[in-house]
Amino acid sequence: MKGICRTVINAVHQSKCDNMEVRDTMRIAAMVFMLIILVGLFINTERQIYKWLAMIFQGLNRPVSGMVFGLLVLTILAVFVVSRIPGMGAYGTLFLIDHYALGFLSYVVIITNAVSLLLFALRLTHLIQFPVSRSVRLVSAALSMLLAVGLTVFGAVHAANIQIRRYHVRLGQEQAGMETIRLVLLSDIHLGYVIEEKHLAKIVSAVNALKPDIICIAGDIFDGDITSLANPGKLMGLFGKMESEYGVYACLGNHDAGDGYQQMLDFLDGAGVRVLMDEAVVIDRSFVLAGRRDSSPIGAHGDTRRKLEVLPDAGPLPVIVLDHQPGNLDEYGSETDLILCGHTHQGQMFPFNLITNAVFDVDYGYYRANATAPQVIVTSGAGTWGPPLRVVTDNEIAEIDLLVPHLESEQE
């Protein structure tokens, strides 16, 4: 019998290893494929921009034009990569400018290739003459650049605003003696070079205006490097001004990790935020609130994620889980009533919202797979990552009015 058990265990272990190897291989293949696509898009962008400029500047040297474009692209990308290195706070202004430049570059590449594809389709359908006339090329070039500038400016202005998204959720079966608890959900603040004191003050003010009973933060409070904060003490004080009856609770996100991990925890502790690391607490004898470690942290993150142990004295109370990534939904069953997530930013900038919508079962809003599955709310986040732009998506705070049973009511 022991031999059979050992054989089964070994087979299961080998199967898991094989599955992991397959997933790793597929992930690498997908990354290589995406890299090839990106290189192709950049090459075509340079080609189209050269054609546009050559109409204005006759005798423009193609190799020189290509080298200048390539150097600009590599500089923007290199500065962004360097901004991810801890301890580079002295260059914060440069990094901020680069983040905006990255957003503009993204739209130049997207729009240029979209226009190129459109003109190709129009030629195939004989709706325009071939070769494309100089006037059509000039107009398409001007409109493309204006649109890229317009979307970048709009995205920057829109990202400075915070929207409120409201939900009404019942936990458990409807019964007498239920009460309403207002839970305010934040995520993906990304404190760093871009999100600093001014934006955090807006967040705190908006949260307090909602008069929450409890505040929950679904990860990515930091942007991976707490040393990038110009005045962490002041930011900690601002964080501490969030007011609620039952306190502020958080789980960690993939960016809440790295060399400054312990400093991040100290910051949150000093601000009165309780971080739940695969643990749970009972809130007002009304529901259990659990928080998870992130499933794929970028850098040091303390202990590894472990199985969630619900409090033994929770009894019939509904269970709410803070889990940063909605890709983990398959870990939960009918024992969980509500899962609160962030991470996706809802793609942050069009058309990336189409990608997150395709990748995740739910990348934004309310979701429930079936009548016995947990309810899920994914927020698009109160901050930004990378380019500080919001196009077709919002920086938001979620106001969730929970209708919950009260334990004392059940016992009476």
Predicted regions located by residue number:
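Alpha-helical transmembrane signal-anchor/signal-peptide segments
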Residues: 160-173
